């Protein structure tokens, strides 16, 4: 009896030591996405890594956070710079905090970029931005998609752009974004 109690206490102590060293669940992105757990980490901290991410077929994935100046407002945006990241976007993200969102960066220059709200469960603003940082168009309050919505009923928007920024619904109006406004976006190596 005494031996099993001692072994149980040792095992419990080891478990507690391991738990104390593990990061808190809120400090890591959601397992189903590479970088869509919001709010985003501060951009001056190292990129977060997620092991076993299904979007990246088991490889570690990085979440790059970029600050983009929009007038007097600084936005903190997760960067989607690969096809897999752009394809996943903000799917299944229940809430986008004020001043945060996602920057979709594309290779090449300004082209017609089409977006849809497949599996996007919160309404969004889509800000289409040219390669020189000029806002071309803002699609405000694009409706969320309910589970089971047929593809032909899912909201879609498109415009000429190199970058597309997704923000929470009505956020572009709140911070004063307008077509023709200049944003300051650091170069992104899009693939």
Task: Walk through the language-model features, giving the residues of each.
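Bacterial N-terminal signal peptides that target proteins for export
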Residues: 2-11
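Hydrophobic helical h-region of N-terminal Sec-dependent signal peptides
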Residues: 10-18
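Cleavable N-terminal signal peptides
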Residues: 13-14, 24, 58
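Boundary at the C-terminal end of the N-terminal hydrophobic targeting segment
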Residues: 20, 24-26
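Compact, glycine-rich, soluble single-domain proteins
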Residues: 27-191
């Amino acid at each position: 009896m005494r031996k099993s109690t001692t072994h149980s206490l040792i095992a419990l102590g080891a478990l507690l030591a391991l738990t104390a060293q593990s990061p808190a669940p809120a400090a890591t992105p959601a397992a189903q996405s590479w970088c869509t757990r919001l709010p985003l980490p501060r951009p001056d901290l190292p990129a977060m890594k997620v092991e076993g991410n299904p979007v990246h077929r088991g490889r570690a994935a990085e979440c790059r956070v970029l600050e983009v100046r929009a007038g007097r407002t600084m936005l903190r945006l997760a960067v989607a710079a690969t096809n897999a990241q752009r394809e996943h976007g903000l799917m299944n993200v229940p809430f986008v905090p004020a001043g945060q969102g996602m920057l979709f960066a594309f290779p090449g220059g300004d082209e017609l970029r089409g977006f849809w709200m497949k599996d996007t469960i919160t309404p969004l603003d889509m800000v289409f931005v040219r390669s020189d940082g000029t806002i071309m168009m803002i699609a405000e309050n694009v409706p969320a998609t309910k589970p089971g919505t047929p593809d032909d009923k899912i909201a879609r928007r498109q415009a000429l752009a190199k970058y597309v920024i997704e923000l929470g619904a009505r956020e572009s109006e709140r911070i004063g974004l307008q077509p023709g406004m200049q944003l300051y976006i650091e170069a992104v190596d899009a693939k």
